[in-house]
Amino acid sequence: MTRTDRRPRQRLDPEQRRAAILDAAREAFAAAPYAAVSVAAVAAAAGASEALVHRYFASKSGLYQAVVAEGIDELLTRQVAADTALGSRAAVRLRLATSIEVYLEVISNSPVGWAAPLRDAHADVPAAAGLRARARERYVELLRGILGLAVDPVADHALHGYLGFLDAACLSWVGAGCPPEQRGALVAMAVAALAGALDAAGVVHALS
């Protein structure tokens, strides 16, 4: 394939080249919806060829899956680290609020990319949607740990409902431009939503 760009390419080892492509893809998918991102643009930003992108990630959807998987792992790692930093004696309400604040920070760093699959689920990559669904189960498990809840179907309905509320509220926040002065209200609303759902389910909790 004939090169369409004439920028000199830096020689990198395979792991460095893969990381450079992934970095470029992360920035591209953070700035635009999936359909608006091209492999050619990612390759050019990474100083690589389209053939190399396909060699490392097989396809555009494979590249997107890698970005989504990395983002999920980063969010969970940051949330666990923030919770650990609070200490085991921290109030449950504070621990939950902190996890929400971490989520808001992650969203504010790439609002377009975060919101795209929520605004148009039909345009999402099925494999990436599967990653998000499995991640939601991991978030539910994390919430159980924060709240000290046993596995219970009714309580899990409340936890899933809370995550749905949080995403819907955050989507509205993104639409408003992610104003930082609204973060406190979002955190308070989300905590209250979960507390209310658990109350309605008859689940004893420590958010009161």
Question: Which residues are covered by each model-predicted region?
Answer:
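Short, basic, alpha-helical segments at the C-terminal edge of helix-turn-helix-like DNA-binding modules
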Residues: 69-75
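Hydrophobic alpha-helical connector segments
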Residues: 66, 80-109, 162, 184-187
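Amphipathic alpha-helical packing segments from all-alpha helical-bundle domains
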Residues: 76, 125-149, 153-161, 168, ...
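Amphipathic C-terminal alpha-helical segment
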Residues: 106, 145, 163-180, 192-207
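Flexible coil/turn residues that form the inter-helical turn or adjacent wing/linker of helix-turn-helix
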Residues: 35-36, 56
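Short hydrophobic/aromatic patch on the recognition helix
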Residues: 46-57
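Amphipathic alpha-helical segments used for helix-helix packing
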Residues: 106-127, 144, 168-175
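Basic, helix-initiating cap at the start of DNA-binding domains
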Residues: 1-32, 39-45, 62-65, 87
